[in-house]
């Protein structure tokens, strides 16, 4: 019944039965993750601590593959499932309060540091601009500001931020310390996208 309600929020007309099946299968896939991690009593694994937190009045979410989802999935959730997106924003803000940083690619209370950039910022800002405001806006702003202004040696999400702030770009080799696997351009583009938000 819950899946029918979730999938039924979008009604598709026209197309073939096969095309409608493809659409609803894709919609189903977009709703799998992030997923609720809090138990029925609200308990969840707190971010980066091994402690147990309690989500009061909201569902705590996990599996924030934000680099993969900040450009598309969260906009869908904001428009069609705003109550779910609001709980996801609350979860991200709570994570920043628990360990100091918004998540990039969080998995069951741990930051994996997988992928690039600072993708929680555009997700939160987009949700706010579309009218979702039932979260701690001041805490969200402080977390975003901390990420965008803290020097690299103390910045878990943007360790190569110093040249970006000083020069507007990140030189080759700053992050990787050599030319293998250098991500300087992608880091600068992702930081710029987050800062523009």
Predicted feature locations:
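Acidic/polar, glycine-enriched structural segments that form the non-catalytic walls/loops
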Residues: 1-60, 94, 101-104, 133-153
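Second-shell loop/turn segments in exported
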Residues: 7-16, 60-62, 73-78, 110-111, ...
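A conserved hydrophobic secondary-structure block that centers on an alpha-helix together
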Residues: 13, 59-63, 73-75, 79-86, ...
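Short helix-capping and inter-helix turn/linker motifs at the boundaries of alpha-helical repeat units
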Residues: 17, 50-51, 63-66, 114-115, ...
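Alpha-helical support elements that line or immediately flank enzyme active sites
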Residues: 23-38, 62-85, 125-131, 195-196
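Active-site cavity-forming subdomains of large catalytic enzyme subunits
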Residues: 87, 91-197
């Amino acid at each position: 019944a819950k899946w029918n309600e979730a999938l039924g929020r979008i009604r598709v007309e026209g197309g073939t039965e096969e095309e409608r099946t493809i659409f609803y299968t894709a919609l189903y896939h977009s709703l799998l993750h992030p997923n609720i991690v809090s138990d029925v009593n609200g308990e969840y694994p707190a971010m980066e601590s091994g402690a147990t937190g309690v989500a009061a009045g909201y569902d705590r979410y996990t599996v924030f593959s934000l680099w993969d989802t900040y450009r598309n999935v969260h906009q869908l959730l904001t428009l069609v499932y705003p109550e779910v997106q609001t709980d996801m924003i609350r979860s991200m803000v709570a994570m920043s309060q628990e360990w100091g940083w918004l998540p990039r690619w969080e998995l069951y209370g741990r930051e994996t540091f997988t992928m690039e950039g600072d993708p929680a910022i555009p997700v939160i800002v987009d949700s706010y601009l579309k009218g979702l405001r039932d979260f701690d806006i001041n805490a969200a702003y402080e977390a975003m500001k901390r990420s965008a202004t803290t020097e690299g040696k103390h910045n878990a999400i943007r360790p190569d931020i110093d040249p970006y702030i000083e020069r507007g770009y990140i030189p080759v080799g700053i992050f990787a310390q050599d030319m293998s696997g250098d991500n300087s351009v992608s880091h600068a583009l992702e930081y710029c996208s987050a800062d523009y938000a």
